[in-house]
Amino acid sequence: MGRSAGFILWLTGLSGAGKSTLSRALRAHLASSMPVEVLDGDEVRTWLSRGLGFTREDREENVRRIGHVARLLAKHGVGVIAAAISPYASSRAEVRRLAEEAGIPFVEIYVQAPLDVLIARDVKGLYKKALAGELAHFTGVSDPYEAPDAPDVTVHSDVDTVEAGLWRVLETLRKRGLLDAAAAA
């Protein structure tokens, strides 16, 4: 059986990098050993952060809200997987600080892929619009993305399979004592 205390897995990376895909794989694997919730950035924007725009302040507020909900869930033994672009290092550091002050383990996972791969994956054409100047405030094109300096885990989704990324995260959780060997297998 998995650990009864909760934790926060914070997946950050540009749009199309594979955060949602990896979060679904993590949920499927972890759900057999503990309660798990995914806080997906797109869903949070629809329900919890409706009305926020894409200014720096609004993006920081969105990350704060996700972090607050993640802490509440983790405090009650839920394994939380937050998958959000969360473009600013200071916002991610604040979420980590608040989690760790509350005694909640926090694992930052950087899901990364080169821009040309992200453009090729972009079925909505958002990168194309942003590069053409038709879409303002698009992270990684017209707005900055501050890549983590020292993430706990890095997944290169252009070369790593979903399974390889999943294994890398599970191995990190096991090494940190957040999963027992059975849940990590």
UniProtKB/Swiss-Prot annotation:
Endpoints of the signal sequence: none
A GO cellular component term found in this entry reads: cytoplasm
Question: Which is a GO BP term held by this UniProt record?
Answer: sulfate assimilation via adenylyl sulfate reduction
Keyword line: ATP-binding, Kinase, Nucleotide-binding, Phosphoprotein, Transferase
Q: Which domain of life is it from?
A: Bacteria
Q: Name one GO molecular function term.
A: sulfate adenylyltransferase (ATP) activity
Segments spanning the bilayer are none
User: What HAMAP family would the database entry show?
Assistant: Adenylyl_sulf_kinase
- Can you name this protein? Adenylyl-sulfate kinase
Give the species: Myxococcus xanthus (strain DK1622)
| Name of the encoding gene | cysC
